Amino acid sequence: MTNIRKSHPLLKIINSSFIDLPAPSNISSWWNFGSLLGICLAVQILTGLFLAMHYTSDTMTAFSSVTHICRDVNYGWILRYLHANGASMFFICLYIHVGRGLYYGSYMYTETWNIGVILLFAVMATAFMGYVLPWGQMSFWGATVITNLLSAIPYIGTDLVEWIWGGFSVDKATLTRFFAFHFLLPFIISAMVMVHLLFLHETGSNNPTGIPSNMDMIPFHPYYTIKDILGLLLMIMVLLMLVLFSPDMLGDPDNYTPANPLNTPPHIKPEWYFLFAYAILRSIPNKLGGVMALVLSILILIIIPVLHTSKQRSMTFRPLSQCLFWLLVADLLXVTWIGGQPVEXPYVIXGQLASIXXXXIXIXXXXXXSXAXXXXXXW
């Protein structure tokens, strides 16, 4: 009699995905972030579910319901801060996961990559709507500023914005629908994650050398299960240090002031994980141009497989491309920092230059360097 995990219709799917899955023998810790993202999603859905039990999506009571969760609900404070800082961990893992894909040429699995980019957009949309829910000053003004960007779309822009708002400004209708979508999207994301994995398992994982690893595979369990658990423990440790020692470190103090449409905060800025996109948006003086740059700064990931001109898949043996990759990382860190600064003298020009550099490295330089390396090595 065969083992039930290999014969049962449901268990055999799990078995072929997480237990007997052949995996390359040399994938490094950079490959841990996929499983960490799965755990992050689970943590966010669970904490979010318990928060939703006590939250009210009404402009009059939203702010005080969050206060009530922190003060009166059993362990409500830890639920709230796990959810808020869990989002930060989610984005740290996301950006590392995408960076890993860029570095090691994982984008050559086009279907997996494209679903991944759509997932990135979905998670960003979810995080944005979640930030609006506590109905603090930064929630309200962030929602106003970001939704207002859609008015830059020619002809239908204004109607579109008012349709999203459900009125002539960000108000009760907006908050209610944002709560509905913030609750719904993570489940859609979960379904898309399954599709992401389905496409990945069609090809199998890439590895740091970028060379096919069909001749040297090991079972996922126990080797990578134990490795994933180690990564998970490290991530939980960092998350708990954030939550228990400095839960508000990544938040904005303005969000502890209830939303007031008559009083604009001095510096409207999003959470840290959107600052790079916000800086790129601000660096273009034209409204429509800024919105296009904002969307394209992330949508550019879609065309990365087309720009791949090297004969090698991974950057492991391409020093020139490595330099450009780390230059891009440094550039995005600098853009993130500028996004948090006020619109003043040195920051404006620096932000514009960094945004131009970010786009130029991603489009022109990466492709040119790969081609040059190929030419130099006379392939």
Curated annotation (Swiss-Prot):
**Gene3D superfamilies tied to this protein:** Cytochrome Bc1 Complex, Chain C
* Sites where the protein binds heme b b566: H97, H196
Any one GO CC term of the record? respiratory chain complex III
> Where along the chain is a ubiquinone bound?
H201
Q: What other comment is given for this protein?
A: Heme 1 (or BL or b562) is low-potential and absorbs at about 562 nm, and heme 2 (or BH or b566) is high-potential and absorbs at about 566 nm.
The name this protein carries in UniProt is Cytochrome b
Function, please? Component of the ubiquinol-cytochrome c reductase complex (complex III or cytochrome b-c1 complex) that is part of the mitochondrial respiratory chain. The b-c1 complex mediates electron transfer from ubiquinol to cytochrome c. Contributes to the generation of a proton gradient across the mitochondrial membrane that is then used for ATP synthesis.
Where exactly are the transmembrane stretches of this chain?
33-53, 77-98, 113-133, 178-198, 226-246, 288-308, 320-340, 347-367
How is it placed in the membrane, per its record?
Multi-pass membrane protein
Binding note for cofactor: Binds 2 heme b groups non-covalently.
Record localization: Mitochondrion inner membrane
Q: Which Pfam families match?
A: Cytochrom_B_C (PF00032), Cytochrome_B (PF00033)
Q: How does it assemble?
A: The cytochrome bc1 complex contains 11 subunits: 3 respiratory subunits (MT-CYB, CYC1 and UQCRFS1), 2 core proteins (UQCRC1 and UQCRC2) and 6 low-molecular weight proteins (UQCRH/QCR6, UQCRB/QCR7, UQCRQ/QCR8, UQCR10/QCR9, UQCR11/QCR10 and a cleavage product of UQCRFS1). This cytochrome bc1 complex then forms a dimer.
Cofactor(s) named in the record = heme b
Similarity-based family = Belongs to the cytochrome b family.
Q: Where does heme b b562 bind?
A: H83, H182
